Structure formats: structure tokens, C-alpha cells
């Protein structure tokens, strides 16, 4: 329940909320993405036969990777989220005035999460390392491509790997 409740709360947010302040954004990202990283971590550790794991390091890494994935998805889907779904996930960001400085700030935030996650991948059980490492590499490439895409183009197109 401690992981599934926040997950379903975030999914419900998508039904009723179209914009976020910092507090609701943090809650949404935790429930929609960070808890998924924590669920995966539990499965990886359980499968490896470890009864426990280094809580702070692996937990922080799992949460950071989940957050990075979600934020990259938000950046990738700016146009569709705003134009089609009427949503704006990033607090204080108006897609109509989205500029390079805003894009760079958001990309740097994602990069910080990716960097933290990268330092913990090697600590995962061996059978999970490659898959998580590949997923990390995919989202790293996506973040790099978003960084290289001009802000005015990012709000009208979907960056792909």
C-alpha cells in the first residue's frame, strides 16, 4: 500500500488536474514514477534472494531514475500534453512562452536525476544491471536530444530516439 496508494493517487490527478504547482508536481512525479522505481528495486532485490539492501543509496537511485524518466517524458510530450490533453506538468512553465533558459533548466534537472541514478546502477543485483543500464542509456540519449533541440521546436514536435 505504501507504494500503490501514491501511484493510484497520481493516476487520479490526471483525471482532474491540468496544471501543477511545485507541491502537486512533486507528489505526481513521486506517485507516477518514483514509486515504480521503488517497486522495481524491490522485485530486483527479492529475485536476487537478498532480504535487505542498502536503503538510502539504492532507494535514492531508484527514485531518481523514475523521476528522470517521467520528466523526460514530460519534455518529450510538451506539445501533445498541452495542445491535445490541455495539461501543463512543469510548475510555472507556460508552453506559449517556453524559451531556451527554461528548457536548459529543466534538462539540467533531469540530468541531475540521471547522474544520481547512474551511480547506483552498478549496485543493483547482476541480473537487473544490464536492463536498468540500457533503460538509463535510452533516456540519457533522449535527454541529450532534447537539450540539442531548440526550445521553439521542442514545443511543436516530439523528440525521438
Which residue stretches match the model-derived regions?
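Catalytic cores of Mg2+-dependent Asp-rich isoprenoid enzymes
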Residues: 1-69, 75-161
